[in-house]
């Protein structure tokens, strides 16, 4: 096998070495400055007013502030969930419940790269583990 160019044929290499961002670039991660609790179909601040910071282990930079739920918040969330289950969810036919669960799984798959990047930023784990194991397994739990 010859490694020399064929006589009379010029090899022209493109000198534009610009690339798109890597699929695992942190640019895909849209992280808000603060996250509240999701209770009864809406986002609400914690009753205590307390938040904790989540930090990136790799850079030690703050990613976001997360609402810190206390007993009253947990009680409100459980009460809302119980009410939703007893009055709505349990009355839906199984096929309809399955459609909702399937849609959640599909949304998780559609946003898998974003979730994997955020999980790796937050937990410090290798992107390959988040991307190839954690997020696909989380979505798989919702498939009906």
Q: Locations of the language-model features?
A:
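Glycine-rich loop-to-alpha-helix module at the N-terminal edge of alpha/beta enzyme cores
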Residues: 59-144
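Terminal low-complexity tails and localization/encapsulation signals of metabolic enzymes
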Residues: 1-65, 99, 103
């Amino acid at each position: 096998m010859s490694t020399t160019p064929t006589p009379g044929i010029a090899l022209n290499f493109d000198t534009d070495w610009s690339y798109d961002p890597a699929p695992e670039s942190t640019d895909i991660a849209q992280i808000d400055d603060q996250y509240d609790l999701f209770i009864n179909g809406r986002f609400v601040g914690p009753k205590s007013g307390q938040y904790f910071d989540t930090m990136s282990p790799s850079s030690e930079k703050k990613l976001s502030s997360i609402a810190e739920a206390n007993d009253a918040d947990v009680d409100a969330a459980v009460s809302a969930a119980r009410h939703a289950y007893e009055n709505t969810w349990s009355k839906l036919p199984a096929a309809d419940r399955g459609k909702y669960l399937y849609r959640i799984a599909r949304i998780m798959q559609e946003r898998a790269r974003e979730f994997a990047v955020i999980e790796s930023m937050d937990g410090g784990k290798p992107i390959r583990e988040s991307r190839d194991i954690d997020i696909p397994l989380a979505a798989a739990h919702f498939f009906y």
